[in-house]
């Protein structure tokens, strides 16, 4: 494997220490290489510089109704073994955010009986952040010959394509879950009996410049296959 010059970063999520490349991104010191994040100058540049935003820092404008249709159509162009479309999109409208906040507030004590007023305030913030909110639902066909695992992978690919579509139109997205995605009360408000929330995706424009985050070195995560020795 080819190696490249690196810096040592402590506390990387993939281990106590991880090797990353020092860079400056959007005028901020980060790790990687000199780049413009979400660079739309070409398809390749956009893929190479894709960066999520923090949902709480996404502000108006968000995608129009026509742009949302484009984004969801792009999202559906994903690998899908068996052509099962094992995913759904649920759009939470601007006028429904308070209803979502109320739903999460009712679910919070079920998740944390000791929840404080600060926890409730955070739940309220979650429901109202960013101009547009899409709930991606994993809806696998359980008794099909295509394994559920493969169908769930397709759902993850749909969510990633959704972010790519939003980025291509100049927006920034954030894909998160949190405890609410695993709350039965919240799940049942968006999903059928055997479906699950794959994520809450928030779209808008960044209120602050995006900052690059640590990325693993290719040499640390990719390797040439070594066939096993014959028994």
Task: Please identify what each model-predicted range represents.
Residues 75, 134, 140-188:
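Small-aliphatic-rich amphipathic alpha-helix that forms the alpha element of a beta-alpha
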Residues 36-49, 196-231:
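C-terminal helix-cap and adjacent tail motif
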Residues 22-129, 229-231:
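N-terminal amphipathic, basic helical "cap/leader" segment at the start of enzyme domains
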Residues 109, 128-141:
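Acidic-glycine-rich active-site phosphate/pyrophosphate-binding loop
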Residues 1-34:
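N-terminal amphipathic/basic-hydrophobic helices that include classical n-h-c signal peptides
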Residues 129-132, 171, 194-197:
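Short coil/turn connectors at secondary-structure junctions
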Residues 186-198:
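Short, electropositive alpha-helical surface patch
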